């Protein structure tokens, strides 16, 4: 049952649907996906702990999640599309959620709640900012949007 949640949860080696969904979806779809749907899967993982005993395979899943998060962290550096970078970084954050929850400690649980809430607010705002950039510059590529800190003062604050 845990593995079924990990397939829907965007864990790198199991299922990599999230970046494709974010890139293809309109901005409102990306915001809803980042703010609500991924959090529902996190809630499922939190509730699932009470049903199953996952101590047997938790260390293997933690290792898999952190290795996948590291790979995607490196992939974020070489991407050229703003929405792809935001989506890959979401998968990295979800890898931390998986590792923290499967750690099976109180600190891991509290850290997961903080990451889930912060990710819901921040990633939605980042997608909205990326849409603002796209509407003004008509491109999601970093190359065409370089120098925005010099041109727009609001991006210095963000």
Model-derived features with residue positions:
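Core, highly hydrophobic multi-pass alpha-helical transmembrane subunits of bioenergetic inner membranes
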Residues: 1-158
């Amino acid at each position: 049952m845990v593995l079924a949640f990990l397939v829907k949860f965007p864990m790198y080696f199991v299922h990599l649907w999230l970046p494709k969904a974010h890139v293809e979806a309109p901005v409102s779809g990306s915001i809803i996906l980042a703010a609500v749907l991924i959090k529902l899967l996190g809630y499922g993982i939190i509730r699932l702990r009470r049903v199953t005993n996952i101590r047997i395979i938790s260390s293997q899943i933690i290792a898999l999640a952190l290795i996948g998060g590291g790979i995607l962290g490196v992939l974020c550096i070489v991407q050229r599309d703003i929405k792809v970078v935001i989506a890959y970084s979401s998968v990295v954050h979800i890898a931390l959620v998986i590792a923290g929850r499967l750690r099976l400690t109180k600190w891991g649980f509290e850290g997961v709640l903080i990451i889930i809430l912060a990710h819901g607010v921040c990633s939605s705002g980042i997608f909205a900012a990326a849409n603002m950039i796209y509407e003004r510059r008509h491109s999601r590529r970093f190359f065409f949007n370089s120098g925005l800190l010099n041109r727009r003062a609001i991006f210095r604050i963000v």
